[in-house]
Each structure stands twice: as structure tokens, then as C-alpha cells.
Amino acid sequence: VQEADAMQILKRLLIPLAALFAGNALAQMPQGEYLDGKDSKVAVVLAHGQGLDADSHVVSPLRKAIHSELGYHTLSLQMPTIAGNRSPDTFQQYASTFPDAYTRIQAALDFLKNEKGVQRIYLMGYSMGARMTSAFLANHPGSGVVGYIGVGLLAGGPEPLNTNINLRKIRIPVLDIYAENDRDAQFAENRKAMVSDRFVQVPIAGARHDYRGYDQQVAQAVTTWLTKHEAK
């Protein structure tokens, strides 16, 4: 009997400790590039393009602009990548990485809320990162994300790769930025029926899908949209 009592006492001690460690694990910052917004209650989580990294083109200048101009927290995530060239086969294989992508996005939301006291989080994705982030929102309607920013949204492929399908399931405000001189514009044309007070499209004149040389225009579109929504 004494041994059984001892085991019960031990269990009562271990359960709170396990919960404590589990909570701390959830609050750990996922791999990526973070800029601290100090007392700001607003954050933007960013996801890079195919085969790139958390400090690569589009996401790197954008995260820095949001932080410097608006003072928000920014967390650019290292998303799953697949080694090899960017062939159509590789593109299709990325669907297998989406569960991992969802885990990383959720870890970012938990970190910002639990460790940084953030109350309002926007999610941004570029190219493959836009496929991943839009799919996350389509499949996690209760995530608490308050707005979505897509740059270079591509619509090829089946679910969950097709951003146009994903976007039809998203009910939060959306900023759809597309390059006017590339395939982005073709996919954006199919989304014009979604345009409303909630769904805004912004073309970047002269830009191609990599947006090189157009960082300022992309940042201006994003910061203007964020400022408008935070003023409501």
C-alpha cells in the first residue's frame, strides 16, 4: 500500500512538471530570422520561396521594412526545402513538406503570443511560401491570424499547392501582391472575382516573379495595408 501511495505522490509531482516543460517547448522560437518589436502587440510571420532561406530576397527586405517603419515584431521562418533543381517534379514533391510547414507556422504563432505578448499576427508568404501559408490558413481557420499577405501567389498544381483554391477558403483580410510582368499576373487575373473590401490586389508595375529591384514598392504596399488595418 505504501508503495502505491508513493507512486501516486510521484505522479502528482511529475504531471505539473511535464506540463511546464511542454508549455516551454511550445514557446521556443522556431528556426528563422527574428526582429523584436519590443512592446508592440503586432507581428508579421513571413515564409520564403522555394529552395531559399529565411533571409533571402523578398522576405528579407520586407521584414526589415516592416520592423523599421512600423515597429512590429517580424519572424521570417526557415521553411522546409527539398534539395535539387526546381523541376516540375520537385515542385509537386513539396506537398509532402506541408505538414512540417504547418508545424513551423504554428510554433511561430505560439512563440509570439506566449513569449512576446503579441495579440495580432499577420501571415505573409512569397511564392512557395505563399502556397504553404495559404494552405495553413485554409486548413486552420481557428489559427487566430488576423490578416494574410501573399506575394507572387502561384496557382498551379492540386491542393494544397494551389493558392487560388486555398484563398477561397480564407475569410480574413487578404493583400494579394503580384508582378505585372510575369506569370504572377496570369494567376492574379483568375483571382479578380475575389476582390472586395476584404480582398485587395496590388500589381507591382515592371516587376517579375523574383521582385528584384522592387523591394521598396513591395514594402510600401505591405506597410500601407498593415497601417490601414491596424487603424481600424
Show which residues each predicted segment covers.
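Serine-hydrolase catalytic machinery in alpha/beta-hydrolase-like enzymes
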Residues: 29-116
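Catalytic histidine neighborhood in serine/cysteine hydrolases
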Residues: 195-210
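Catalytic active-site module of serine/aspartate enzymes centered on a nucleophile-bearing elbow/loop
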Residues: 215-232
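Gly/Ala-rich beta-loop-alpha elbow adjacent to hydrolase catalytic centers
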Residues: 124-133
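Conserved loop-alpha-helix segment in the C-terminal half of the alpha/beta-hydrolase fold
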Residues: 185-199
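Acidic catalytic loop of the alpha/beta-hydrolase fold
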Residues: 156-157, 180-185
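Short beta-strand/loop motif that positions the catalytic acidic residue
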Residues: 170, 176-178
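A conserved short beta-strand
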Residues: 142-156
